[in-house]
Amino acid sequence: MEEKKGQRIVVQSLIGTKQLPFYLKCLKSLIQFSKDKFDLHLHSDGSLSQSDEDFIHAEIKDTEVTISNSKLNADHVLDCLSGKPNCQRFRKESIWGIEFFEPLFLDEKDPVSYYLDADIIFLQPFSGLFNRSKTENGAIFLKDTQWDAYCLKPLDFIGKH
């Protein structure tokens, strides 16, 4: 993984209190199996309490973790979307609006945003997933550097009935 002029990579994700233990399990697997170092920034759907945030910081110890203030972040993103009423409406009315816009405006000085869904569990070591040189001419979505990812449904863990 490359860092831009000593700048740490920041990987962002959206979480909420409803599935918090599962999200943390997945995010800890990301940290555990990534050979590359990064900071983690968590956006909230607005449901996180102070005790949830304390729990997050107690659980994730191997990387720097920051958590957005949902209200302040929403106001900032809506300001950034000034003059784009459809985008503002989408941001206000949909969880997908949070997921789509908030990572883009976290650091306006950094043109690259790394975003990962919080419900992806990693099962083996990997490197190079967050590589600035691969984003020079646009964006990469759903990147799998090894082409051997697996999709498992919850019932796969229970067995056949």
Regions found by a protein language model. Give the residues of each.
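Short C-terminal domain-edge/linker segments immediately following a structured domain
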Residues: 41-46, 71-74, 99, 135-136, ...
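Active-site-proximal specificity loops/subdomain of glycosyltransferases
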Residues: 57-109
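GT-A fold catalytic core of metal-dependent nucleotide-sugar glycosyltransferases
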Residues: 95, 99-145
